[in-house]
Amino acid sequence: MKELEYPFDSGYLLKKKRSIKRQLLSDGSVRIKKKIAVLGGSTTNDIINMLELFLLNYGIEPIFYESEYNRYWQDAVFGNEEIDSFSPDLIFVHTSNRNILKYPAITDSKEQTDALFAEQMKYFETMWEKIAERYHCPVIQNNFEQPYFRLMGNRDAFDCRGRVNFINRLNTAFADYAASHESFYINDINYVSACYGLDKWSESSYWHLYKYAMCVPAIPDFAFNLAAIIKSVFGKNKKALVLDLDNTLWGGVVGDDGVDGIEIGQETHMGQVYAEFQKYLGLVKDTGVMLTVCSKNDEENALAGLNHPEGSLKPDDFIMIKANWDNKDRNIEAIATGLNIGQDALVFLDDNPAERAIVSAQLPTVAVPEMERPEDYIRVVDRSRFFEITAFSSDDLKRNEMYKENAVRAAQQAQFTDYGEYLHSLEMVAVIDDFLPVYLPRITQLTNKSNQFNLTTKRFTTAEMEQVFADDSYIRLYGRLADKFGDNGIVSVVIGKVNSDTLDIDLWLMSCRVLKRDMEYAMLDNLCDRAKQRGLKTVKGYYYPTAKNKMVKELYGDFGFTKVSEDADGNTVWELSLSGYEPKNKYITVERNK
């Protein structure tokens, strides 16, 4: 089909993929059928849909197995009955730089970065060896695209602590593995991702006609990058960031929306954007750049926003906080004086174009980049190369003596043959507690989107959830799970109604992101403990089957409940006596919200 030949129109294919598939399947072609298992470290549905079109066009009719989100390593190393019965003809491991478990820290030694590299390679080699041992089929593995920011600028490419350097080492090691193993192939997304932009950069006519190594329109970008190195060599880097708060570090206005109304964290897509920006700023801080705040806010509200549980930047991360109703240019002058640096060493970040214009007019030596879209904040700051690093010493670390950003990941897993040992190695910590107002939007969202691990599939509106929150006849639990690789956010919700000496579980759900981690046992232990504290004797659970929740059909039975009834539609009722209940959680340390 012409539409699937290079050069193709990506937008057209994405828009018309269903009709194109129908045309291909009805064209009378004879195709070989092949079973392809896709083990994904990110969402793979649209990849599979598009891959199917190209394969059909090549005369291959694919049958796909798609792993659960980010379960690629566990499925490969510990096995999966579904994949075993699927018996794939080929396995594709779709990972990206988002799946690198830990990058070198700016404080790491060469020995530490080498050890981290060895651990990362062991992680993947363990997976590849298990796949080869179990499935005996070809394997296609992505290498890694370049990172979306360079913390040290061009030094990232040759400093062992740089992300660019670390990814390049991994890509070379992946290539060496492929060269020495039959039926193992690299999907070179490092090249493909670069090619998506490199095509314009490397326009061959500029070389053949003028011997330019790049197209003329790219020369300003080249010169800007070169100038960043030169200005760093001669001591002209910026030294401090001056940060607005509302709609800069989080979405919304904390004074109007309240702490529980601002967007930060995993609950919304914009909350994730702001959370990622805060984490990036924390990394910048670790290089010695000073962080300050200049915000039109009551100080109480500003501090409350900075103390939001989903934010990674806290008040202690900032050397100075100017949260008042004075003109921002005056506050920035005070910050420069307080830090004992020139105004030309400051970078002011603010989403408000009026505030940016005033500061630019009143303080012309302060750098004021255009901050239009939150999704672009990291790109704007990083590619402006305000803090290009050409040398790095311990003195740079001392410049900013506040707490460094907490490490989001620790040493990665080595090979495990016992799943229990693997769970222990995760060092999981759960916060399980009664609902908090700040989490009600996320809890409500979970009730309306969780389908697989959801025993009753009961939905709640915001108003209904607020009623549950205010009613003491309910036992309510939210659970958030973190491990040494990061925080999963709120992943489980249980709501039980107290009726006499019995607790009726109206809702039990859990995010599929944490399946097979024993979080359900931690929730059950906590639920039973609270029920006992209220003098209850029995817990009743209900399972209402849907097209998507069959995976939890026997959950209460696995918990030790006794099935007491089942109707013609498959709805079941289960009971558990609290007398003599023994805790079941073995692997998770449980805390209450602090």
Give the ranges of each region predicted by the language model.
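Terminal substrate-recognition subdomain of acyl/acetyltransferases
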Residues: G338, S360, P364-L426, D529-K594
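Conserved Lys-Pro-Asp/Glu-containing loop-to-beta segment of HAD-superfamily phosphomonoesterases
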Residues: I332-P353, V359
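Extracellular glycan-modifying ectodomains
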Residues: M1-V242, L249-W250, G255-G261, A354, ...
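A conserved beta-strand-loop-helix scaffold within acyl/acetyltransferase catalytic domains
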Residues: V431-S511
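Basic, amphipathic juxtamembrane/active-site segments
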Residues: V254-K279, P364-E372
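Acyl-donor binding region in acyl/amide transferases
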Residues: K484, I490-D567
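Substrate-recognition element of Asp-dependent hydrolases with the DxDx(T/V) motif
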Residues: Q272, E276-N307, V359, R442, ...
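Substrate-recognition/cap helix-loop segment adjacent to the acidic, metal-dependent catalytic center
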Residues: N297-A323
